[in-house]
A protein has these predicted regions:
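Catalytic cores of carbohydrate-active enzymes
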Residues: 1-53, 59-73, 77-85
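Non-catalytic C-terminal accessory modules of carbohydrate-active enzymes
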Residues: 81-180
Length: 180
């Protein structure tokens, strides 16, 4: 079925709806943005990016901790500053009573909350590399001030390895070579 959308009269912008019909919302997620992640129906490679941006801007719950997906969804929409803020927030939050810094939480699943770290890791990867079918897009949501060495996997047994300095790729290797 088509993704439910509507036009917002005062802005004349379209937005994604959580469902074709619904009564009241009963948890702290933004189901309308599932069309961005995990289903990837909207994004940088797809039509309707403005509609997805509007849905992200108007989401009811603005959170990046636990299993909240703002970090991933903002990266997939190319919103680099927002993705960077969410990723930093997730990685910097740790539980002071735990021996290991990566024992995030307590969020929704208590301690350790591995959803919290996995969301940050997926978002960080999508900030560096995104893909759709055979197409690869590098640095779609990467802040220019961040430098990084990376080695990431993409579909079709592809590995993208490189270095980014001051917003520019200074070293890149894609294997197999025909995927470059």
């Amino acid at each position: 079925p088509p993704v439910p959308t509507r036009c917002i009269p005062h802005t004349r912008r379209g937005t994604i709806l959580p469902a074709a019909e619904y009564d009241e919302l009963a948890n702290c997620e933004n189901p309308e943005l599932y069309a961005v992640f995990p289903y990837r129906l909207f994004g940088l490679f797809r039509p309707g990016i403005d509609t997805a941006h509007a849905a992200y801007e108007m989401r009811l719950f603005r959170k990046s901790g636990g299993w909240q997906q703002d970090a991933i969804q903002s990266a997939l929409l190319g919103l680099g500053d927002e993705a960077a803020r969410c990723v930093k927030e997730n990685f910097l939050e740790c539980h002071g009573g735990s021996r290991f810094p990566a024992f995030w939480g307590p969020n929704y699943d208590w301690i350790p909350d591995m959803d919290h770290g996995s969301v940050a890791c997926v978002a960080l990867q999508r900030m560096l590399v995104q893909y759709d079918g055979d197409a690869l897009l590098l640095l779609p949501a990467w802040p220019k001030a961040w430098n990084a060495d990376f080695r990431l996997h993409a579909p079709r047994n592809t590995v993208v390895e490189g270095r980014v300095e001051n917003g520019k790729i200074v070293r890149l290797a894609v294997t197999p070579p025909e995927r470059e």
